[in-house]
């Protein structure tokens, strides 16, 4: 990720009117899967103006596919036990869980209008065991917070001048955000 020039990219204040007109004052998140959605959410919560770009016609498509299996969100194990399951990375995972543990995730889902339950295995699921209501709530909240979502924008790299390049139905598009994150996980296998 490019270092964020916060004074240029912060939303609000006297320059709030400039954020929509000047893409160089915004942060671009490329990828509309869970990693991209959470990045957009966290950047927006930090006061930054955010544009999220997704190659497909909607965000969270693989998330919806994962939800067909009941959408195991997390596990209810106590933090030390949960972290220990990651063996050599247990210390790192333990630190992450200090900031956002299973209870925080359940609260986050509840904030999107989705209640959860702990199954007999200790796994945490949405009450209706579906991904779509969670995704709809998440996208609705991001839009309400001012995140601009651009679908059918396939990132192709940077041009010689350093602009981010996208293929869109309207043709090539170049942008120069203040900073960018590429959250294009979930590479297809096979």
What kind of feature is each model-predicted range?
Residues 6-27, 45-46:
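Extreme N-terminal leader/targeting segments of oxidoreductases
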Residues 25-52:
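N-terminal Rossmann-like FAD-binding beta1-loop-alpha1 element of flavoenzymes
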Residues 44-68:
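Glycine-rich FAD pyrophosphate-binding loop
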Residues 46, 112, 145:
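Conserved dinucleotide-binding and phosphotransfer motif residues
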Residues 70-118:
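Glycine-rich active-site loop/strand segments that organize a redox cofactor
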Residues 93-101, 121-140, 185-190:
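Short beta-strand to alpha-helix junction loop
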Residues 133, 140-190:
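Predominantly flavin-linked oxidoreductase catalytic cores and closely associated redox partners
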